[in-house]
Every structure is written in C-alpha cells, then in structure tokens.
C-alpha cells in the first residue's frame, strides 16, 4: 500500500554499513511508555545504502529525544531490506526503488502487507573525475556507455581513453532504478526493456566505493545519490534527449522536476506503522526531520 500525496502532506504537518546499536533485543513494532521521553521500543531499519546515511541521522536524533528507544540501521541494499521485511527480520525496509510486483506477491503470500512511505527525494547524480573534459551527456549516451556501445570517451567529446563504467551491484535499488530509467531509457521514445548492463561494467557493493574509484580514476563514471557527491568528483549535466537542456542535479532541479533522473526514497513497513515506528516516521516527515534531509544532502519532500 502506498501513501497518497494528500496523506503524505498531512504527515508533514504533524507536530513535531553503520549500526547505531551493536546488539539489541527486539521487543516488537509497538512502542510502550518509558520513564524518559514517553516512548520505548526497539526496531531495525535495513536496506538501501543510499538511504542509510539519512536514516542514521534521523535515528540518532530520535534516540536523543527518546532515550528508551533503540534503532539499528544497516545498508546492505534495497533488495536485502525488502527481503528482510518479507521474511520478518526487519520492521522497516529502506529503499531507493519501489517494490517489484513479484516482491509484493511474495510478501502477501507470507502474510506481510507492504506499506510504502516516501520519506525524501534523491537526484541520482552522474559523476566523473575532475580531469575529464566532458560536462554533459544525454540519457541515450549514458545508456550506450553502460551497455558497452560507447567504450571510448572521445565518442562523447572527451579524451581518447577507455570508459570505465561503474555500477552498484544487483542488490542495490540504485542499480535497479538506473537500469530501468537510464540503461533501458524508460519513458523515452528510444526505451528498450531488453537492454542490460554490459559485461565491461564494474559492479561495486557500495556507493562509497564507486565514488572513491571515480575520484582516483580519470576515466571512470558512476551514478551515486546526490548526498554522496563531494568536491573530489565532477557532476555531469544530464539531457533527457539531445534537444533538451542539460540540467545539473540539485535540490532545486529535483524539486521542480527539470532534472531527469530524480527518484523517491522510501520506507516500507508491514501494514500502517503504529507505536514507536509511527512516532519515528512522523518525526522523519516533520519540518525538523525534513530539515535534516537538506543538511544530509538529499532533497526534501515538496509541499
């Protein structure tokens, strides 16, 4: 189940890998009144490597407000988090992609009712080494790079040097989103669902590793979330088609819809959240929580 925009806006008006806790005893999804702060309870948030830093910030702040609450956050990938929700080994799955229909069917078969909550937005950025003279690419050019049809930077106006295309691994929601919306060019006249990542693409298990490789390798290209971009790499402007303007990723361009590779960041719970988890998500969607989104380098929910 997905929260519609009207409901999400109402939530926004409510007042109001890192493990934050090494070992916790799970005591269920519902919180109980505590001696300090009025809430107590423990739960896990497992999933997206992209969402992990934001969840860590929120969890740290929430546990300061409610000392009897314990939240453990880990980011092995969206697919792992969704599988954990289906298996009942996490209370919250964090994801940088929507659940697949097959995953929803698996969940329902196990008595799990996936409930989707958008908690922020992300501009999926394309980065290269600062020494790379290329400043912009079209979606079609990116697709050609990641399907091994373009293998030399000179083919897109760069140096005569081999392209080193880096991707997240298959457990990553970022991997899936980029495949659908860039590699397969979803929504464009040239869309092709048969396209796959090429055999020359280098798959890495974390966003940090991909960004680090681009900072060191003058021929590398990668696609981290906006929150992972540093001054050690160079952002490329992206054109939806050759006739469209080249747009750099930013909070502003993601919010106004001009950046072509923006995506929702999501939490999934088993049914509508209650108790301490509901209170935590209320905080995430509050004005204070959304300010943390901006501070962490992500895009807040639009009003």
Predicted regions and their residues:
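Bacterial N-terminal signal peptides that target proteins for export
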Residues: 3-16
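Extended alpha-helical regions
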Residues: 1-5, 301-302
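C-terminal motif of bacterial Sec signal peptides marking the signal peptidase cleavage site
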Residues: 24-28
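Exported/periplasmic ABC-transporter solute-binding proteins
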Residues: 29-303
């Amino acid at each position: 189940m997905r929260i519609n925009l009207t409901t999400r806006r109402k939530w926004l008006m409510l007042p109001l890998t890192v493990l934050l806790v090494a070992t916790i005893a799970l005591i269920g999804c519902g919180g109980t009144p505590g001696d300090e702060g009025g809430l107590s309870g423990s739960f896990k948030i497992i999933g997206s490597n992209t969402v992990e830093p934001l969840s860590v910030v929120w969890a740290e702040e929430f546990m300061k407000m409610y000392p009897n609450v314990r939240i453990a956050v880990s980011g092995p990938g969206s697919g792992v988090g969704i599988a954990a929700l289906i298996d009942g080994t996490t209370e919250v799955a964090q994801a940088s992609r929507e659940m697949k229909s097959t995953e929803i069917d698996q969940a329902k078969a196990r008595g799990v009712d996936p409930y989707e909550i958008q908690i922020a937005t992300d501009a999926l950025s394309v980065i290269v080494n600062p020494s790379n003279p290329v400043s912009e690419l079209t979606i079609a050019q990116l697709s050609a790079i990641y399907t091994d049809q373009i293998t030399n930077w000179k083919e897109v106006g760069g140096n005569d040097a081999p392209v080193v295309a880096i991707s997240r691994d298959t457990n990553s929601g970022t991997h899936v989103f980029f495949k659908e919306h860039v590699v397969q060019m979803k929504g464009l006249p040239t869309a092709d669902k048969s396209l796959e990542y090429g055999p020359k693409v280098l798959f890495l298990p974390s966003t940090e590793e991909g960004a680090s490789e681009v900072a060191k390798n003058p021929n590398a290209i990668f696609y981290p979330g906006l929150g992972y971009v540093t001054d050690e790499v160079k952002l490329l402007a992206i054109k939806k088609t050759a006739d469209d303007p080249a747009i750099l990723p930013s909070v502003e361009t993601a919010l106004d819809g001009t950046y072509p590779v923006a995506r929702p960041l999501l939490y999934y719970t088993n049914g509508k959240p209650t108790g301490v988890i509901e209170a935590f998500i209320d905080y995430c969607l509050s004005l204070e929580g959304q300010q943390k989104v901006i501070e962490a380098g992500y895009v807040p929910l639009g009003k």
